[in-house]
């Protein structure tokens, strides 16, 4: 797995305000844990720890 911003099918981060929301989204996708990264590269987005390789992550390029 990898530590990364989890993304949806449009390469957009999961916008967040609370750590609990991100921890839930990350763990239900197989990650160890997750939290809300405030004012990061992509704004307020969910960061997951040890996310499985099959789950899409935010990559360079536009959020569609």
Swiss-Prot record:
SMART domains: Knot1 (SM00505). Its main location: secreted. One of its GO terms (cellular component) is extracellular region. Gene3D superfamilies: Knottin, scorpion toxin-like. The keyword Lipid metabolism does not apply. One of its GO terms (biological process) is defense response. Disulfide bonds join 12-63, 16-36, 22-46, 26-48. GO terms for molecular function: sodium channel inhibitor activity; toxin activity. The modification Arginine amide is found at residue 64. It comes from the Eukaryota. SUPFAM superfamilies: Scorpion toxin-like. Keywords: Amidation, Disulfide bond, Ion channel impairing toxin, Neurotoxin, Pharmaceutical, Secreted, Toxin, Voltage-gated sodium channel impairing toxin. Expressed by the venom gland. It is found in: Secreted. Negative results: does not show effects on Nav1.2/SCN2A, and Nav1.3/SCN3A voltage-gated sodium channels. Does not show insecticidal activity. Has the structural arrangement of an alpha-helix connected to antiparallel beta-sheets by disulfide bonds (CS-alpha/beta). This non-amidated recombinant toxin slows fast inactivation on Nav1.1/SCN1A (EC(50)=52.8 nM), Nav1.4/SN4A (EC(50)=32 nM), Nav1.5/SCN5A (EC(50)=116.7 nM), Nav1.6/SCN8A (EC(50)=46.3 nM), and Nav1.7/SCN9A (EC(50)=147.4 nM) voltage-gated sodium channels. On Nav1.1/SCN1A channel, acts as an agonist by inducing a shift in both the voltage dependence of channel inactivation (alpha-toxin activity) and activation (beta-toxin activity). Belongs to the long (4 C-C) scorpion toxin superfamily. Sodium channel inhibitor family. Alpha subfamily. This is Delta-buthitoxin-Hj2a. It comes from Hottentotta judaicus. The lineage of its organism: Eukaryota, Metazoa, Ecdysozoa, Arthropoda, Chelicerata.
